[in-house]
Amino acid sequence: MHQIDVKILDNRLRETPPHYATPGSAGLDLRACIEAPLHVEPGQTTLVPTGMAIHLADPGLAAMILPRSGLGHKHGIVLGNLVGLIDSDYQGELMVSVWNRGHASFTLNPLDRIAQLIIVPVLQVGFNIVDDFDASHRGEGGFGSTGKA
């Protein structure tokens, strides 16, 4: 198992530090480290602190902040940037861009779970500039070009 450095910036997280909920969990819950309830109106986007910072320190890794499925499906609360990408050399506090795409005001309470953090492998590549590609079956076929499911 990889180990990464985590800096707890909000002491309330020391009681319940980020952890995998089950052995099969891919993501760790990120919490809203706010002092008072925060009302997010329809169409509003706001940055919410998570009370923690990470330093992956390995260019072969990156972190991704993803939405929690229940918040999006039940309340229309998703990430304002859709996915947050955290580079291996970033060391600042993790912030979550919360967007209310729903039709009703939503209240975030202190320490509510607002997003998930996953760690993913990264492959940096070099580019070989070419004039043409070798032919493939798909070619330039794009959106919907492979037929119906």
Curated annotation (Swiss-Prot):
User: CDD domains this protein is in?
Assistant: trimeric_dUTPase
A GO molecular function assigned to this protein is: dUTP diphosphatase activity
What is any one GO biological process for this UniProt entry? dUTP catabolic process
Catalysed reactions, semicolon-separated: dUTP + H2O = dUMP + diphosphate + H(+)
EC class name: hydrolase
Superkingdom is Bacteria
Q: In which pathway does it act?
A: Pyrimidine metabolism; dUMP biosynthesis; dUMP from dCTP (dUTP route): step 2/2
Q: Which InterPro entries match?
A: dUTPase (IPR008181), dUTPase-like (IPR029054), dUTPase-like_sf (IPR036157), dUTPase_trimeric (IPR033704)
Q: Which UniProt keywords apply?
A: Hydrolase, Magnesium, Metal-binding, Nucleotide metabolism
Its EC number(s): 3.6.1.23
Q: Where does substrate bind?
A: 68-70, 81, 85-87, 95
Cofactor(s) needed:
Mg(2+)
Q: What family classification does the UniProt entry report for this protein?
A: Belongs to the dUTPase family.
Protein role: This enzyme is involved in nucleotide metabolism: it produces dUMP, the immediate precursor of thymidine nucleotides and it decreases the intracellular concentration of dUTP so that uracil cannot be incorporated into DNA.
What protein is this chain from?
A: Deoxyuridine 5'-triphosphate nucleotidohydrolase
- Which organism is this protein's natural source? Dechloromonas aromatica (strain RCB)
Specify the taxonomic lineage.
Bacteria, Pseudomonadati, Pseudomonadota, Betaproteobacteria, Rhodocyclales
